Amino acid sequence: MAEDYDFCLDNPLFYVSSKSIPDISKKFSVPLPDNWDEYKQNQEWVALFPLNSKIQRQGWKVHISSKIDQSEDILNIVSEVCFSMSITFKHLSSLEFFVKRNSKQIDRGVSGKFITCYPNENDLEHFLNILEEKLKKFDGPYILSDKKWKESPIYLRYGVFRDSNKEDGYSCDSQTLKINDKFILDQRLPQFVVPEGLQIPDFLISWISEEDEIDDKDSYVMPFLIEKPIIFSNSGGIYRGVFNNTKVIVREARPYTGIENNGLDAVSRTKSEKLALDKLSNIEGVPNCYWYGKLWDNYYLVTEEREGVALNHWLTQNYPLYDEKYDEKTSNNYLSRITSIVEQIIKIVKSAHATKIYHQDIHMKNIIIDTQDNVSLIDWEQSVYNEKDKRRHLVAAPGFRNWGYTTPENIDWYGVYQVANTLLYPAIVQSDLVYGYGKQTSIAGSKILEKFNYSKIEIENYIKLLDTLSKKIGNIKVLSPSKVLHPYLEEENYDTLENKKNRILKGLFEGFDSIYRRWEKEKRFFPVHYYGLNKNNGVAYSDLGVLWAYSQLLEQLDIPKNSEYEELEKHLVSKAIINIEGNSINDNGLLDGISGTIWLLDRLKYTREAARLYSKHFKKLISSSKNMRLYDGLCGILLVGIDFSSKGLLSKKVCEDVFNEIEKFTLKYINHPETFIPITKDNKKSNDPYKINGGLLYGHAGLGWLFGEMYHLTSIDIYKKALNVSIKNELKVYQVDKHGTLQYSQGDRILPYLSMGSGGLGILIYENYKIIDNEYKLILNKLYKAVDGNFCMFPGLFNGLSGLKVCQFFMNKYLSEVNNDLILEDYIDELNGYLIKIGNGVCIAGDGGMKITEDIASGFGGIVIALCCFIQNDFILLPKVKI
């Protein structure tokens, strides 16, 4: 099941639940008449209803939309009508939620709704007529899931009003309609749908069949042809089309939608872009504007389609990730190409500034590059025309937001600077977290290019270009809490491996203490990635997992546990046991649930308690497992069982039960593997652990880990057979790329990671090298090539550098490509590009690069476990049998 992640980015350092951030925006409220009541359904909605009254189970919902500056007036009018007619209604609770409901990225099926009314069908026509008369002078965004009533911002759709109850005579939830004794899904789509078989009131029949009114029929004749959509958002679509036999881009703007932090809506931004393009029409590298106007309710901007691809796509195709050493005759000469690209961008920006136009949203996706490396700068909708008006950079892509109050000119140059940094070292999102991070990426990027024998002069010239751009930005006084974070600029080129290793271990130790004292310990004791904010069990994201990693760090540094640590450990262990015994946990998996927590108790030397809990709850864990996967399913639960069995921690009876379950699991898998995990490529790109079906943690390779460990324990051939079947099935969703690497295929990308890709499969083959079929031994080299890249976006264990290097280390034991000490040294050197200096220590920004995390999957915990794998010469992330 896919998870809905409740998080926000308002905390400057950490991911936090949106519920933990107070809403300080203006609240919507109306006086409450006698015999009425009010309650908050949730943070977003306030419901008002007459006492001792009932509403229909389902019916015609009446939705009201509003312009932001008319919202209070509309609420007062609608509430008075509802009060007078005793009609239940609800409204958004605050201005913050109003803006979110009308923002660019909101689901189009729910956007625009400010007030929802629930009239009984007998009152519907009269209610609509009264509202229409009172709201004629108001405007609001079109609600795409509904149909507009007449001229006012009133919209209707048929849907569920409430859950069913005993009086209804049937049982169904708020997602289900009952039509003619059939139960159907109440779909919230971005289009008006009338449920099949619905009996429609007479006065609505003609309304449903008629087209929405258009003031001027001629205004709906499109002067351009739309060929296909590129993307949809709440603000409108972006399309490819044709205008006067010329290929064009058509940008649609829906009024009063796409409200951003600067208060501008989609139409305002489109008008701004039109003005900018007209003034820049003679500048090379800026697309021409061909047409602008209103059609029906929406506005359209038609611009020249520039040939080429977005610069971020160009980067993925050309960055020297696996290329051979630089050779003038054979290389694409990456460094000279990116120098030319940056110089072209500088020229365009200088020309625009000379006309007093400032782009304000320069980033990789807004730059188009053709096959000849010619550059175009597109998407001028954020443009401003006052160079001296200092402001905060409110609308920006991740990694491209300038710091503090600054001028529009400086905002543009910061964008160019960050583009240049990205082309040198693509992981620049951390720039939003750490002021001056570009100094760190320039060092890391230079080291990558040095591997390809680019001359020192070439590299220095590019660094000088970066320095020139940096001077255009100026210095900012950082006053936010993130001022405690600094770029990690330590030079360690000539130090010994032992000193490098000790330095990073000590840095992680000091940094952990600094973070612990800054983190507000309300529900969680450590900051984690948003994937794990609501998952405080299992190995991946739990507090106990972080504590295990920290305990491993103390052991490596030979630092005794102090009283504060011991008190915290006792508290977390006690809390974990109480939660398990209290049956208050729904997740049972190894990485996200109870079985993982029990395994961690053993890792923390609470072995007797871990064995007792597993024995007591084993059958319930098995019966309530959600799926078959290692990450969150039956496979991980059984794996903990054979780990404990091999150590003699379980009674004979429990061991027999575990072994019987594994035997049934294995036989069923051999005969019907497709029923365990789909053997098809994932079409959608995602790092979400609940949306992936490949790799060691989520795919057939994870099942293979269980089969391999069971064979090591029992030497029964059926488990060896199942292991080979699992590798065969895993490989069905892998592909070889142009560099000869073998990687997991997902959507239009391929992945080498420990959790989902080449690295994890390589670890499985390494651990079972002596018992797998020869054909699978032969692919180890291609998997090794996949993890032996020059760059990775993030530093973490599951989906980042740490996991890749651990996998490379163990695969190399059979391949002997390099000395394994060199792999550890490379890992530490490359990790320097991601480290953040805090106090006397260092910390890590997890996957995404936006916030500090300490979990095992993405942050501090994963770095520590990776280092321990190297130092202990053992893959310690997953349970393994003791023989």
Q: What kind of region is each of these model predictions?
A:
Residues 2-19, 171-228:
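Juxta-kinase regulatory segment immediately upstream of eukaryotic protein kinase catalytic domains
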Residues 382-447:
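C-lobe/activation-segment region of protein kinase-like
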Residues 27-46, 206-244:
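ATP-binding glycine-rich phosphate-binding loop
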Residues 138, 476-524, 687, 709, ...:
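Terminal, non-catalytic domain-edge segments
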